[in-house]
Each structure stands twice: as C-alpha cells, then as structure tokens.
C-alpha cells in the first residue's frame, strides 16, 4: 500500500515535470554499477556532448520503501541541459533490503562513475552529491562518510572517492535524524521499521549512525539545503542547518516564512509551475555553478 502511494506521487511529479523538459538530452539507461539486480544507474548528458563534465549524482526519494530514478527523468534532463553529466542510481528498497544497503550502493555508484569516467563523460574531480527526501538523507550520510574517516570506520564502509573530489551537496526535503522526533507518526514508524529491520530503533546502535547531524564535521562539503514551510520534515532540515552553521560549514539555505501561502509541502521543488519550485531550481543551479 505504501509503495502504491509513492507510485502515484511519482507519476504526478513525472507528469508535472514533462512540460518543462528540454530536448536534446541523451540517456544511458541501466548501466550496471554492481552485481545485484538493483545495482544499475542512468546517465544523462547533452546530445553530442564531448569529454568530461561536472557530474551530479542525484539519489531519488521515496521513504526508503518506494520511488524510482525513472520518476525524476525530466528533472535530470533539466540539470543535464545546463551542461552537467547527471547520474541517477537505483538502490534497493525496504523491507526486502535494509539499512545500510542503500548507503553501500551510493558509495559504489561514486566508485563506479570515477572508474569509468571517460566512457560516462564524468569529471571525477568535480562531483556533486544530491538527493530529495530519503535520497537527501542518503546523500548527506554518504557525504559525511566521505569527509569523516572516523565516521566511515564506525559505519564500516570505505569511501570510494577523496573528500576533495566532492565539490558540493544538494539536499531537498530530507529526513536526516530518525531520533529527532520522540513520537513519530505510525507511517514514519512503519517506514523506519522496514528500513532498519528492527522494532527497537532506540536500541539499535547501527541504525543510530543514520543520524547525520550527530556525525557531520567541519569538513562537510559546501551544501545547498531546502524544504517547504509546510513540509512535515522541515524540523529535520532546520536541525541540520543549525548544526552545519555551528560547525562553520558553507551552507546555502532556501527556507520560507511560516505563513507562506499557498503552503509549500514535501518535495515542493519539483513543482515547476509554481514560483517557489522555479526559485528552488534557480537557486540549485546557481549553487552548482559556484561549486563546480
């Protein structure tokens, strides 16, 4: 049932973005980055593009139990039209796969695109890690892993790139700390049970490592962060921003006054028929241009 909800939401996003999609974009579909059935990625770039380009690895959302890279194809086309190579991985979903499998997969994606940079038109020295919703959590966690050897050792996953290769991070409407809300909704609780594979989340030390604000360091890359004023996950974003600001991390934040109307909900950035959605895309592109 939960996946059906995400399929409907994803289809609506796909339809909404279709009218904004540019022409002249090529897609390499389902490039294997590992041995598993979910270990595939898509690569987008301008038709006829030659040589390497700054590369965005964008991890899709879906509460770890749904969503797909295909639902955001027109978003990736928009980014590729700006001259970027865009990499969109599939990752394994809960409850069939549990944490930290998707973290390992995103790390493997970074290693794969660097190992095959020439063929995929990737510039391995100019990488940006990005994501929305659950994908934003994965992007933030992997960026922490890349830039903190202590955290990488604790989580037991070896980075596949150097910290200086990761030029920036883009985070949209993410859930960064499962311990932030002491009384999560039944929906959130069910999602976290599925993703962790454990009912006692408070007692699961490994799952506690998912809490990004507790583990980021001053070496975290420059980051763009946004969420809507009516997003239920907004407190997750404000807590992360407060932590990053306290560490002195260069943070470009797009948040909105509480009385913004119409209210901006979860994943508002994909609604390009709205002024707020267009502002988010413009700010993301400006951040990318500065960083790579």
Model regions: which residues?
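Alpha/beta-hydrolase superfamily serine-hydrolase fold, recognizing
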Residues: 1-292
